């Protein structure tokens, strides 16, 4: 053993002894603590999303904010958000749409999303956290659903803040990460970490919608997959049709 390693080892042992805990006991206690915390997290039972218990909240998918997104191209993000909205509509989920400072700062919702949701009102607000706006909060709570799927720009603010608020209210919050966007890698990584720490469930938009679909024999299946417009799914369908001939 090198001199430095010996001294470090001796120092750790001495520190543990001074605290009245043998080195091995201290390590064992720490591992036990970690195990208990991991087990407590694992005890949360899986309760799937369904058409009856979920709602979709789309936040601040506005032209001005879209231009600053750096973790997805504009085309890819639009594709994902519109696919999420159309699939949710096919699955008959309640959908809440909101913008912030539409006329003074960030502009309107991007046109493709508006076209995908004809007749769905868009609530414009001034609050940063959408859940702080009484009209948005009322629209969400009026659905009677306890599982809330959020997507927004930016990920770490517009999606994260209301999702974490929902968790604080005893609701289950999900964030469709690839239907959200942000302005730097740091914002993305810290935002994801903060949401995980708060108990928000992170996923991608297609997985969330397929979870709700549950059974490919459902009449809505074709509309859901068509809405998500996944190139690989189209390829699989084409191959299946070819082999079926």
Regions found by a protein language model. Give the residues of each.
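A contiguous pocket-lining binding segment that forms or flanks enzyme active sites
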Residues: 147-198
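A short acidic, amphipathic alpha-helical/loop segment
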Residues: 109, 135, 161-165
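Glycine-rich phosphate-binding loop signature in dinucleotide/nucleotide-binding domains
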Residues: 140-146
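Active-site acidic carboxylates
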Residues: 33-127, 142, 172, 189-196, ...
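N-terminal export signals
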Residues: 7-27
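Short phosphate-binding loop-to-helix
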Residues: 125-138
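Secretory targeting signals
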Residues: 1-5
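Acidic, metal-coordinating catalytic cores used for nucleic-acid/nucleotide bond scission
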Residues: 102-104, 129-130, 155-159
């Amino acid at each position: 053993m090198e001199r430095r390693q010996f001294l470090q080892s001796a120092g750790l042992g001495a520190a543990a002894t001074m605290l009245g805990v043998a080195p091995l006991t201290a390590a064992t206690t720490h591992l036990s603590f970690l195990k208990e915390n991991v087990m407590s997290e694992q005890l949360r039972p899986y309760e799937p999303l369904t058409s009856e218990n979920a709602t979709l909240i789309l936040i601040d998918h506005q032209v001005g904010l879209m231009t600053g997104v750096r973790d997805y191209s504009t085309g890819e993000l639009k594709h994902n958000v519109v696919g999420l909205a159309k699939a949710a509509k096919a699955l008959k989920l309640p959908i809440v749409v909101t913008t912030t400072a539409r006329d003074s700062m960030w502009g309107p919702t991007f046109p493709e999303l508006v076209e995908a949701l004809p007749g769905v009102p868009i609530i414009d607000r001034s609050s940063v956290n959408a859940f702080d706006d009484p009209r948005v909060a009322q629209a969400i709570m009026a659905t009677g659903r306890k599982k809330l799927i959020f997507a927004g720009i930016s990920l770490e603010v517009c999606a994260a803040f209301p999702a974490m608020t929902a968790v604080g209210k005893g609701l289950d919050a999900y964030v469709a990460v690839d239907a959200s966007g942000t302005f730097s890698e740091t914002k993305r990584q810290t935002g994801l970490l903060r949401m995980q720490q708060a108990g928000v469930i992170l996923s991608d938009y297609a997985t969330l919608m397929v979870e709700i679909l549950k059974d490919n024999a459902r009449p809505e299946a074709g509309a859901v997959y068509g809405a998500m417009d996944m190139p690989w799914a189209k390829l699989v369908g084409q191959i299946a049709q070819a082999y079926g001939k």
